[in-house]
Amino acid sequence: SDIIENGPYELEEHVRDIFQTKGLTSKEVMLGIQPLPNQVTRYDTYIYNNSAQYKATPMFKNLLKDDPREEWMLGLLSPKDTIYAITKYVGEKIEECYAIRLTEMYLLKAEATVRAGKDLGDAKEPLKTVMGHAGITDFTKIDAITDRDELLYEIYKETVKNLMFEDGIEWSMLLRFPMEVILKVKPAIREKNYIILPIPAAEFEKNPTIGDQNPGYSKI
């Protein structure tokens, strides 16, 4: 709460401006990274800058249905296309990436408030603030929620809409849910071991006393 209330950062009035015009100069960006000139080509290999490699899944497209962000986050690259591409990163700022934004702090506050067992109204306030800055004006659905698990899932969905294709925070939040919720989003994850990474083999060579490998993996 302190960084939200007393920090030098401000939520961007028009969210798309962060990614398409202002970049790291936006007052919302708390930590951002710009590749050096000799790193741009390598960076472009992995970024979602209108590349045909990155297409919106039906699930993500459905998530943005009737959402103001759909207009600028998804689009057809040509009249012949039938599958929507990710257009969040277009314009002059495609090489800049965002590790931490103030929006994330609001969403973390909302999640922490719910998980701490506090009043749901206190959790809805930062959530609705983020939604409002994204252009949403109807909060009827959020206001009607009385179940903690339901509100947590709405916070997760808003985290995906806001922070997808940035620093992977939406994946971190998903892993904080019970397995049945994770499977709802990622059916391919058939067991808990799928979300646990192995300890690199080199670590066992450097430190023989490190102990056992993580469940589901061998040391070799």
Model segments located where?
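Acidic/polar-rich alpha-helix caps and helix-coil junctions
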Residues: 1-45, 62-220
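Active-site-adjacent substrate-recognition loops and nearby beta-strands
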Residues: 42-55
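Residue-level signal for threonine
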Residues: 56-57, 200
